[in-house]
UniProtKB/Swiss-Prot annotation:
Disordered: annotated segments: 1-48, 165-186, 258-296
Biological source species: Arabidopsis thaliana (Mouse-ear cress)
UniProt family annotation: Belongs to the IQD family.
Residue ranges the record marks as coiled coil: none
Pfam families xref list: DUF4005, IQ
Gene Ontology annotations for the cellular component aspect, listed alphabetically: nuclear body; plasma membrane
Cellular localisation: Nucleus, Nuclear body; Cell membrane
Superkingdom of the organism of origin: Eukaryota
Name assigned to this protein: Protein IQ-DOMAIN 24
Length: 401
């Protein structure tokens, strides 16, 4: 506007200024030709001046236009620069915002993972503690059970040792008091004498039974003794008038009483007082007598034999083998009404008759008292120990009254 305003303003001024007559106070000359020439020169000078001004104005206007164009270009460049800088800043801001969001999400994921891992670790720790407690409980139960078993075994061992000591002490005390009645030199000779006595027809040996309180070691000991007994004794044949024995053995070791208590033993009045005997005599009244060998009682044999348990004694096969090798148990038949029981020092009840008692009294002067039972069988694999037992039986007492 300024450039065009100045341009049009100058034109208006040029139009507004008419050619006026210049006043001059100089004197007129008398030469008119000189005046006209001077006047034309002046006009030429004015035109030159006007042309110079116009050229200057045009140059100035062009310069101003260039300046305006440069200013506009500068403004445009500044705007471009501003716009460019704004885009970069926005992109940077967007990138920073995205980075912030990613960092926040990453931090949140890390927090969630750490919390979950802590939960899993605490859960695993609780499970491990529970497993350790369970293992401790199981081990404690097993240890307590083993300790209880060991204590029971120790108690059983102590009881057995006490019984063995008591048995040895009673044996020593009995050996210090020798008996008055002696066994004959051989069981066969004594048996021949007893057979001649018809009145002494029945001999019944019954042990005291405590089946509910016997120990496994005692049963194995008695099984071994019974096996040795079968190998020791050989039995001759008997007639119909031969003696028979009713054996009720409980397979439990018992202790012999001391000689001081032998006089105070209780003697039952009759055979019918025994429930074991009553159950066995019911079916023996109408049959004929069988020819059966004489079998010694296990408890009587135990009185002279040692205690030698066998680790195979508690098995069923061993018991069946022993039962198959042993003689069958006899039944009581035709007991006389005057017969009775008498108890020996081993705690057994023996059947006797008055005639047999008189015969024993007659033989007591000669020191004859013995054991009269031998079983009919083979003397299989008789060892040195069995021979020693045979010699021991031939030189030691068996019954005491």
């Amino acid at each position: 506007m300024g450039f065009f305003g100045r341009l049009f303003g100058s034109k208006k001024q040029e139009k507004a200024t008419p050619n006026r007559r210049r006043w001059s106070f100089a004197t007129r000359s008398s030469h008119p030709e000189n005046d006209s020439s001077s006047h034309s020169s002046k006009r030429r000078g004015d035109e030159d001046v006007l042309n110079g001004d116009k050229h200057a104005i045009a140059v100035a206007a062009a310069t101003a236009a260039v300046a305006e164009a440069a200013l506009a270009a500068a403004r445009a460049a500044a705007e471009v620069v501003r716009l460019t800088n704004g885009g970069r800043n926005s992109s940077v801001k967007q990138i920073s915002r995205s980075n912030r969001r990613w960092s926040q999400e990453y931090k949140a994921a890390m927090k969630i993972q750490s919390a979950f891992r802590g939960y899993l670790a605490r859960r695993a720790l609780r499970a491990l503690k529970a497993l350790v407690k369970l293992q401790a409980l199981v081990k404690g139960h097993i240890v307590r059970k083993q300790t209880a078993d060991m204590l029971r075994r120790m108690q059983t061992l102590v009881r057995l040792q006490a019984r063995a000591r008591a048995s040895r002490s009673s044996h020593v005390s009995d050996s210090s008091h020798p008996p008055t009645l002696m066994i004959p030199s051989s069981p066969q000779s004594f048996h021949a004498r007893c057979v001649s006595e018809a009145e002494y027809s029945k001999v019944i040996a019954m042990d005291h039974h405590h089946n509910n309180h016997r120990s496994p070691m005692g049963s194995s000991r008695l099984l071994d003794q019974w096996r040795t007994e079968e190998s020791l004794w050989s039995a001759p044949k008997y007639n119909e008038d031969d003696d028979k024995i009713l054996e009720v053995d409980t397979w439990k070791p018992h202790f012999r009483e001391s000689p001081r208590k032998r006089g105070s033993l209780v003697v039952p009045t009759s055979v019918e007082n025994s429930p074991q005997l009553r159950s066995r005599t019911g079916s023996s009244s109408g049959g004929s007598r069988r020819k059966t060998p004489f079998t010694p009682a296990r408890s009587e044999y135990e009185y002279y034999s040692g205690y030698h348990p066998n680790y195979m004694a508690n098995t069923e096969s061993y018991k069946a083998k022993v039962r198959s090798q042993s003689a069958p148990r006899q039944r009581l038949q035709d007991l006389p009404s005057e017969s009775g029981y008498k108890r020996s020092i081993q705690g057994q009840y023996y059947y006797y008759t008055p005639a047999a008692e008189r015969s024993f009294d007659q033989r007591s002067d000669n020191g004859i008292a013995g054991y009269r039972g031998v079983s009919d069988g083979l003397d299989r694999n008789q060892s040195d120990k069995s021979k020693m037992y045979t010699s021991f039986f031939s030189s030691n007492p068996l019954f005491f009254q």
